[in-house]
């Protein structure tokens, strides 16, 4: 990790600064996320799966910052998981890297939900039993923000759909 990345990690670890960043990026500057409603989460994402050869495969990734945000917005209360990735250099596949973090976080939510259902033996259908997830279960949204710290103008993709996809125009809207 570069010195710039380390300093940015320390800077945005502060809940007031983190809330400001999120409010500006996600809500156009409106004060929706409050510093006192942020809670630090483990930045390590670990996902295990059974490979084709029946051996366990484990993948571990470390986020720069990951927080739990309790939000009151449009009269309702929400919980959102927000990660920040500090980037000193242009990273031409950053949307895929961030998507990988997000998929791991969603996968862990599904795994924890399935574990709870197995313990409580409360899956109603064979489909729910197989997936470990019921029709009523909900995932907590995961958002990852990239903070670019470089001096060159960012010319990399900002979304997965602009990450060198080789899709025909008619398929582009489906990706």
Which residues are covered by each model-predicted region?
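Accessory alpha/beta interaction modules
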Residues: 1-169
């Amino acid at each position: 990790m570069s010195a710039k990345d380390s300093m940015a990690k320390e800077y945005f670890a502060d809940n007031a600064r983190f809330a400001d960043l999120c409010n500006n990026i996600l809500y156009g500057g409106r004060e929706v996320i409050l510093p006192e409603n942020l809670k630090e989460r483990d930045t390590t994402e670990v996902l295990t799966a059974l490979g084709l050869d029946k051996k366990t495969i484990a993948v571990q990734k470390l986020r720069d910052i990951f927080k739990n945000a309790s939000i009151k917005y449009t009269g309702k209360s929400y919980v959102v998981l927000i990660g920040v990735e500090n980037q000193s250099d242009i990273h031409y596949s950053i949307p895929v890297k961030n998507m990988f973090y997000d998929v791991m976080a969603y996968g862990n939510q599904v795994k924890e939900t399935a574990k709870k259902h197995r313990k409580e033996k409360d899956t109603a259908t064979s489909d729910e039993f197989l997936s470990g997830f019921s029709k009523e279960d909900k995932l907590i949204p995961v958002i990852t923000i990239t903070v670019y710290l470089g001096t060159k103008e960012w010319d990399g993709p900002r979304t997965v759909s602009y990450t060198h996809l080789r899709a025909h125009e008619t398929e582009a809207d489906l990706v």
